[in-house]
Amino acid sequence: MIRINNLQKNFGTKKAVDIENYTIGQGDMLGLVGNNGAGKTTLFRLILDLLQADRGNVTINDIDVSKSEDWKNFTGAFIDDGFLIDYLTPEEYFYFIGKMYGLKKEEVDERLLPFERFMIGEVMGQKKFIRNYSAGNKQKIGIISAMLHHPQLLILD
């Protein structure tokens, strides 16, 4: 599903990412553990084409992420709360994300049901902007929005 080929990213003289070849198959789960500054977030940003590699490429389902955006239709991601539109309420944000994937309001409401117990009283119905939530609740909002369209691939940092 994800293929990394000769991927390299440097920041000045610091080599942040240097992966010769690596494949993550369908159904695989991978966790990255490392010190601060080890390149974990940089790798996620390269995979999601949020950062340009110095060398190499990433393909998702044989689609080069730097040449096509088709992979976004079946990929969900949440890296940090910078992904969130913080001047919206969570409800507005979920409907916005749903609309991006062609979901109607009713479909979004239905897809939010499994997450109700994590959100009732804390996130949903509060009528406040995302910027006013705790870091933990912002993470909940981001993770749920990444899963809203039932992606085949989920990338979380």
What are these regions (language model features)?
Residues 30-35:
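The feature captures the beta-strand-to-loop junction immediately N-terminal to the Walker
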Residues 56-71:
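Conserved ABC transporter NBD signature motif
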Residues 143:
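Hydrophobic anchor residue at the start of the ABC signature
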Residues 48:
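Helix-to-loop junction immediately C-terminal to a conserved catalytic motif
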Residues 2, 17-19, 72:
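Conserved structural motif at the start of ABC-family nucleotide-binding domains
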Residues 148-152:
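A short, proline-enriched helix->beta-strand linker immediately N-terminal to the Walker B motif
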